[in-house]
Curated annotation (Swiss-Prot):
Participates in various redox reactions through the reversible oxidation of its active center dithiol to a disulfide and catalyzes dithiol-disulfide exchange reactions. The record marks D25 as: Deprotonates C-terminal active site Cys. The gene is trxA. Belongs to the thioredoxin family. GO terms for cellular component: chloroplast. Pfam families: Thioredoxin (PF00085). One of its GO terms (molecular function) is protein-disulfide reductase activity. It comes from the Eukaryota. This is Thioredoxin. Residues 2-107 form the Thioredoxin domain. The record marks G32, P33 as: Contributes to redox potential value.
Length: 107
């Protein structure tokens, strides 16, 4: 499963109402660290395709959701399970850090 883009309008359907845990990458095109973490997020999406959904949301184009979740710096990666935010990772982190965080929420 590839990474899909979500918007303010599709966030509830794609993230909150999803049965799988969802990794949400809050990013913007001008953000250097966001571009650095993007390949890591893509690799995670491939490796965990049967157990999680991975989505990206452009904070410039979708300010409502970014404000709702208090996004102050990007990249911010949030994990949602059963419609609730269960964890947050801020900044461009190594794949190992992101994987170990995700593993806590995969049953």
């Amino acid at each position: 499963m590839s990474v899909s883009q979500v918007t303010d309008a599709s966030f509830k359907q794609e993230v909150i109402n999803n049965n799988l845990p969802v990794l949400v990458d809050f990013w913007a095109p001008w953000c250097g660290p966001c571009r650095m973490v993007s390949p890591v997020v893509d690799e995670i999406a491939e490796e965990y395709e049967s157990s999680i959904k991975v989505v990206k949301i452009n904070t410039d184009d979708n300010p409502t959701i970014a404000a709702e979740y208090g996004i102050r710096s990007i990249p911010t990666l949030m994990i949602f399970k059963a419609g609730e935010r269960v964890d947050t990772v801020i900044g461009a982190v190594p794949k190992s850090t992101l994987a170990s965080t995700l593993n806590k929420y995969i049953s």
